Amino acid sequence: MWEANPEMFHKAEELFSKTTNNEVDDMDTSDTQWGWFYLAECGKWHMFQPDTNSQCSVSSEDIEKSFKTNPCGSISFTTSKFSYKIDFAEMKQMNLTTGKQRLIKRAPFSISAFSYICENEAIPMPPHWENVNTQVPYQLIPLHNQTHEYNEVANLFGKTMDRNRIKRIQRIQNLDLWEFFCRKKAQLKKKRGVPQINEQMLFHGTSSEFVEAICIHNFDWRINGIHGAVFGKGTYFARDAAYSSRFCKDDIKHGNTFQIHGVSLQQRHLFRTYKSMFLARVLIGDYINGDSKYMRPPSKDGSYVNLYDSCVDDTWNPKIFVVFDANQIYPEYLIDFH
């Protein structure tokens, strides 16, 4: 199921409150066949209907039966990703995982009212995301150091670095970048005709001045640097945190910031600074040894369409990966360490 854009939600709610309720009351006769609809991300009303994609557990008919039993009550249902509750009194649906709401309506059923898959609907967000705010470009959610999620990230870092150096780990929640990544993954699976694409969690070290830009726009080697581009002109990732740490800089922005607050450049050592490293989800797919001249992965068969997905330092034991398409990357975690 999909989340509605907040601005669209409020506009539709205002229009809906002026028209639909009166129309429903006037037309509520015993021989009317009613359907139940939700306001989709595309701005159109889609009918509730079980389907193989979302695995929705409730149908329009189920909702109507519940409504007739108790017009001021509610009904709960699930999809493959989330649990929901429909409130008949409010005529709204709430995602019990994220807390997000969207409008629903009861309207006369017609053949044209059947639901359909809209091409520009949003892809469901990961179920472990929390307090999602769709009105900001991204969110940094601090992970508690006792959680499984924190320890999973810290253990990957700790394979080649001392995990006690970690100051904090934050989850990056960027719906736009997540959708781009998911659509790219689906595209590659369709192109290859395979059920899964080779995907790895890889590290990327960078200067602190680029952190916010990466969280908003994703990685861009033209801006973030390419560290020599030995294996191609793309974004570089490493299997080992120790390697990526070589490119992390605790360059505070910058000397002027301290001077404005009355701190001299000589006193900067009194302030503890931290370095930043990303742990990204990367679709490495099919890879080949890289070359400094590559602007994109080379062809598998000499054609212009059948290309590798990424380049590496050594196909037998890859430690460095180069990705040329940002949509193959989702910057998932930001690790601050000293």
Curated annotation (Swiss-Prot):
Modification type ADP-ribosyl glutamic acid: residues: E13
InterPro entries: ARTD-AVP (IPR051712), Poly(ADP-ribose)pol_cat_dom (IPR012317), WWE_dom (IPR004170), WWE_dom_sf (IPR037197)
Residue ranges annotated for the PARP catalytic domain, each copy included: 123-338
Cellular compartments per GO CC: cytosol; nuclear body; nuclear envelope; nuclear pore; nucleoplasm; nucleus
Pfam families registered for this protein in UniProt: PARP, WWE
Family assignment from sequence similarity: Belongs to the ARTD/PARP family.
Name of the protein this chain belongs to: Protein mono-ADP-ribosyltransferase PARP11
Gene: PARP11
